[in-house]
Design a protein with these regions (language model features):
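Extended surface/linker regions that mediate inter-domain or inter-protein docking
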Residues: 1-67, 75, 87, 91-235
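Short cysteine/histidine-rich metal-coordination sites, predominantly Zn2+-binding motifs
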Residues: 71-82
Length: 235
């Protein structure tokens, strides 16, 4: 699952006017030197195509400086206080539905950025991938369409649990208006053992750290069958 790697890489070039600045960094994504994917973006090969998508670190990693002139230090586990996650969702949805998101516009950019494509990739794989990505984004973000009923979350904030409800098919049209907004700051996730038994979530409705972490993972697209319990337990 996830976005084809090269399609993800060229989206900011296809629709630069739909971003607040240059590239994904303008939405608060963090890039480490020597890496071509932002922190919190995992990559794996599926059905012969390299695919990328968000993982937990995208919301729970940020940088700090010891002085205004110091080099930023990446700190895992702290809130991603510059990340505009709603902005990212809206950008992807708008770009894949834009008239520019076509094989004629996108494939040449991939060929240029990747150093060249074989005939199979140029004529079949990526043209098909463009249509599949449009359909996939329509399916996923169609479920997350409730974000268009909300005010902008702003950087460092997310409506995680409405996202989880949406992914699992909760009919938002049946929810009372006061339940449509559940936006909260990204939390720090270090020293979680000390939080066991505390009243967790933004409304304090659960006391188990494990449940909080699983619910957050479901909100970013994890599924009960595929979720990595061991990796989540390490935090």
């Amino acid at each position: 699952m996830g976005f084809p790697y090269w399609l993800f890489q060229v989206l900011p070039e296809v629709c630069p006017d739909l971003l607040p600045g240059k590239g994904y960094a303008s939405l608060g994504f963090i890039y480490e030197p020597g890496h071509d994917l932002p922190v919190g973006m995992s990559q794996r090969r599926h059905m012969g195509i390299d695919r990328v998508f968000l993982n937990c670190a995208v919301c729970h990693a940020a940088t700090v400086r010891t002085s205004p002139d110091a080099k930023p230090m990446l700190v895992a586990g702290m809130p991603a206080n510059q990340l505009d996650l709603m902005g990212f969702q809206k950008f992807v949805q708008a770009c894949v539905n834009d008239r520019r998101f076509t094989p004629a516009q996108v494939v040449p950019r991939i060929a240029e950025k990747s150093g060249g494509l074989g005939i199979l990739d140029e004529r079949i794989i990526y043209p098909l991938g463009i249509h599949l990505m449009r359909d996939g984004v329509a399916g996923l973000l169609g479920r997350l369409n409730f974000i268009h009923l909300q005010p902008d979350w702003g950087p460092g904030r997310v409506d995680t649990f409405n996202s989880a409800k949406a992914i699992f098919g909760v009919p938002f049209e049946r929810l009372p208006k006061e339940e449509l907004v559940g936006v909260a700051d990204f939390p720090a996730i270090w020293n979680q053992g000390r939080k066991q038994g505390m009243q967790l979530h933004w409304d304090g409705n659960n006391s188990r750290v494990e449940e909080r972490n699983l619910s957050a993972a479901f909100g970013t697209g994890a599924t009960p069958k595929l979720i990595d319990h061991a990796a989540i337990a390490r935090i």
